[in-house]
């Protein structure tokens, strides 16, 4: 079944193209960042996020990640600037992580794998609907934040505490009054390139903003992500401990840096 993709050997990233041919396309994500090959582009502006904490609605476990969903029916929580030519609406954020602290991020920087990677997914309302934006090369903007291991991050704990309500696949719970900009690093420097979703159908519609500076969370906090299950409540328990796609070929794309 096409919709039964996952991260196991039989349905994992190596098989996605069998059902979703674009997964072998020319603009796939994630990628390896080699900083010596990336040039500073002085035309790249600063970016800003103005998020309404009341637009957060629910948190859910879809068996592949945990996701927080936002009200995107109007311009409530917006991303502006950077490489973007228009304001984009926040729709959801989710994370990718690994089975241990030494890996889990999808993008890598000079060979460094971080413990996890946060993706904030926004869409361009000039295309009227999210579905319409998925069909456009600049329809979606994703801010990627790396998580490294160190001291605990209190703001991240607010989110983690809600995971107890969505332990198993298919669970959903109210989750509001949360401003995800509290999960951004102090430094707003970023790399940008044209890419895709890192999960099927792997549509090539994304302007990526990858933040150079990781945020620091504790080992226990990342372990909390691994306490989720990819199985439903009535099924034999399968821990959700590996949900990252490996880097894809750059195929001539240019990565630009907002900083020197």
Curated annotation (Swiss-Prot):
<feature type="modified residue" description="N-acetylalanine">
    <location>
        <position position="2"/>
    </location>
</feature>
<dbReference type="InterPro" id="IPR018338">
    <property type="entry name" value="Carbonic_anhydrase_a-class_CS"/>
</dbReference>
<dbReference type="GO" id="GO:0009617">
    <property type="term" value="P:response to bacterium"/>
</dbReference>
<feature type="modified residue" description="Phosphoserine">
    <location>
        <position position="43"/>
    </location>
</feature>
<feature type="binding site">
    <location>
        <position position="119"/>
    </location>
    <ligand>
        <name>Zn(2+)</name>
    </ligand>
</feature>
<feature type="modified residue" description="Phosphoserine">
    <location>
        <position position="29"/>
    </location>
</feature>
<dbReference type="GO" id="GO:0008270">
    <property type="term" value="F:zinc ion binding"/>
</dbReference>
<keyword id="KW-0456">Lyase</keyword>
<feature type="domain" description="Alpha-carbonic anhydrase">
    <location>
        <begin position="3"/>
        <end position="259"/>
    </location>
</feature>
<feature type="binding site">
    <location>
        <begin position="198"/>
        <end position="199"/>
    </location>
    <ligand>
        <name>substrate</name>
    </ligand>
</feature>
<feature type="modified residue" description="Phosphothreonine">
    <location>
        <position position="216"/>
    </location>
</feature>
<comment type="similarity">
    <text>Belongs to the alpha-carbonic anhydrase family.</text>
</comment>
<feature type="region of interest" description="Involved in proton transfer">
    <location>
        <begin position="64"/>
        <end position="67"/>
    </location>
</feature>
<feature type="modified residue" description="Phosphoserine">
    <location>
        <position position="50"/>
    </location>
</feature>
<comment type="function">
    <text>Reversible hydration of carbon dioxide.</text>
</comment>
<dbReference type="GO" id="GO:0004089">
    <property type="term" value="F:carbonate dehydratase activity"/>
</dbReference>
<keyword id="KW-0597">Phosphoprotein</keyword>
<dbReference type="GO" id="GO:0005737">
    <property type="term" value="C:cytoplasm"/>
</dbReference>
<feature type="modified residue" description="Phosphothreonine">
    <location>
        <position position="176"/>
    </location>
</feature>
<feature type="modified residue" description="Phosphothreonine">
    <location>
        <position position="73"/>
    </location>
</feature>
<keyword id="KW-0963">Cytoplasm</keyword>
<dbReference type="InterPro" id="IPR001148">
    <property type="entry name" value="CA_dom"/>
</dbReference>
<feature type="modified residue" description="Phosphoserine">
    <location>
        <position position="55"/>
    </location>
</feature>
<keyword id="KW-0007">Acetylation</keyword>
<feature type="modified residue" description="S-glutathionyl cysteine">
    <location>
        <position position="187"/>
    </location>
</feature>
<protein>
    <recommendedName>
        <fullName>Carbonic anhydrase 3</fullName>
        <ecNumber>4.2.1.1</ecNumber>
    </recommendedName>
</protein>
<feature type="modified residue" description="Phosphotyrosine">
    <location>
        <position position="127"/>
    </location>
</feature>
<dbReference type="GO" id="GO:0016151">
    <property type="term" value="F:nickel cation binding"/>
</dbReference>
<keyword id="KW-0479">Metal-binding</keyword>
<feature type="modified residue" description="Phosphoserine">
    <location>
        <position position="219"/>
    </location>
</feature>
<dbReference type="Pfam" id="PF00194">
    <property type="entry name" value="Carb_anhydrase"/>
</dbReference>
<keyword id="KW-0318">Glutathionylation</keyword>
<feature type="modified residue" description="S-glutathionyl cysteine">
    <location>
        <position position="182"/>
    </location>
</feature>
<dbReference type="InterPro" id="IPR023561">
    <property type="entry name" value="Carbonic_anhydrase_a-class"/>
</dbReference>
<feature type="modified residue" description="Phosphothreonine">
    <location>
        <position position="129"/>
    </location>
</feature>
<feature type="binding site">
    <location>
        <position position="96"/>
    </location>
    <ligand>
        <name>Zn(2+)</name>
    </ligand>
</feature>
<feature type="binding site">
    <location>
        <position position="94"/>
    </location>
    <ligand>
        <name>Zn(2+)</name>
    </ligand>
</feature>
<keyword id="KW-0862">Zinc</keyword>
<dbReference type="GO" id="GO:0005829">
    <property type="term" value="C:cytosol"/>
</dbReference>
<dbReference type="InterPro" id="IPR036398">
    <property type="entry name" value="CA_dom_sf"/>
</dbReference>
């Amino acid at each position: 079944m096409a919709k039964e993709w996952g991260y196991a050997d039989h349905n994992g990233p190596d098989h996605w193209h069998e059902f979703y041919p674009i997964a072998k396309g020319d603009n796939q994500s994630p990628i390896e960042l080699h900083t010596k090959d990336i040039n500073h582009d002085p035309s790249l502006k600063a970016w800003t996020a103005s998020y309404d904490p009341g637009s957060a609605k629910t948190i859910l476990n879809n068996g592949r990640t945990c996701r927080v969903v936002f009200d995107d029916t109007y311009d409530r929580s917006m991303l502006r600037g950077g490489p973007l030519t228009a304001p984009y609406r926040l729709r959801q954020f989710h994370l990718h992580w690994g089975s241990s602290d030494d890996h889990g991020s999808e993008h890598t920087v000079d060979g460094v794998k971080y413990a996890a990677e946060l993706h904030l997914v926004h869409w361009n309302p000039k295309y009227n609907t999210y579905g319409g934006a998925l069909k456009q090369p600049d329809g979606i903007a994703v801010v990627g934040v790396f998580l490294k291991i160190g001291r605990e991050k209190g703001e991240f704990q607010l989110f983690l505490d809600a995971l107890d309500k969505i332990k198993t696949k298919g669970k959903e719970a109210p989750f509001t009054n949360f401003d995800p900009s509290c999960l951004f690093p102090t430094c707003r420097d970023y790399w940008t390139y044209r890419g895709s979703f890192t999960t099927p159908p792997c549509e090539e519609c994304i302007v990526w903003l990858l933040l150079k500076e990781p945020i620091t969370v504790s080992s226990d906090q990342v372990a909390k992500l691994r306490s989720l299950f990819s199985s439903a409540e009535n099924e034999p328990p399968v821990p959700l401990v590996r949900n990252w796609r490996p880097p894809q070929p750059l195929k001539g794309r240019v990565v630009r840096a907002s900083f020197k």
